[in-house]
């Protein structure tokens, strides 16, 4: 793909769903309000996805349209969406039984409990043949920008870090799994990248 062709990207945003008293609740009635709305690993979490888009304007428009539909429906149902990375409260968060959850429980074990308390935004960028290393290194360089959007320092009601989500993912949930959770170092050559993927 020549560099002049558009780079397709999509976004997934996750929100905690709360009732009018601020208690976490299931997103009943919200999933069907728009295309791209889905349940996640845990009961009170809602994910809204876009399709791959070629322009920022197209991506923004689709995300705003889908999010707007969910927000209007949430308002009708007395629900709210909370964009915090981790909930402030200390209560347990119930799993949403699924094959994905069972796999994570089997692979990650007890440490998957940390993931249950995390919501976030995920950006998917189309891989360009021949440009994989430049793309990876660019994304690694952009990662520190996460520090600018930390939204909750809490895990189970306790202040644990300025950005609890990063700490939970990188240093607790996936700490025992090489190549998962932590930020990968820059890559200098294709062979190094291939070796990492084979591990």
Predicted segments with their positions:
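Terminal catalytic/cofactor-binding subdomain
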Residues: 1-112, 117
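Loop-rich catalytic cores of soluble enzymes, especially ATP-dependent carboxylate-amine ligases
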Residues: 117, 126-199
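An acidic/histidine-cluster motif and surrounding catalytic segment
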Residues: 123
């Amino acid at each position: 793909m020549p560099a002049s062709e558009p780079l397709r990207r999509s976004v997934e945003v996750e929100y905690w769903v709360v009732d009018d008293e601020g208690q976490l609740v299931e997103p009943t009635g919200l999933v069907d309000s728009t295309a791209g709305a889905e349940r996640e690993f845990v009961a009170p979490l809602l994910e809204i996805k876009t399709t791959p888009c070629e322009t920022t304007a197209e991506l923004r428009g689709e995300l705003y349209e889908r999010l707007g539909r969910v927000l209007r429906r949430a308002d009708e149902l007395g629900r709210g969406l909370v964009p915090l990375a981790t909930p402030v409260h200390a209560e347990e968060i119930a799993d949403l039984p699924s094959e994905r959850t069972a796999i994570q429980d089997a692979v990650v074990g007890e440490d998957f409990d940390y993931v249950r308390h995390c919501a976030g935004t995920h950006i998917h960028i189309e891989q360009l043949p021949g440009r994989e290393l430049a793309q990876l290194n660019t994304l690694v360089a952009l990662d520190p920008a996460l520090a600018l959007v930390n939204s909750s320092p809490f895990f189970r009601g306790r202040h644990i870090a300025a950005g609890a989500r990063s700490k939970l993912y990188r240093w607790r949930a996936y700490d025992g799994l090489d190549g998962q959770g932590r930020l990968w170092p820059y890559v200098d050559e294709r062979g190094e990248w291939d070796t990492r993927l084979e591990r």
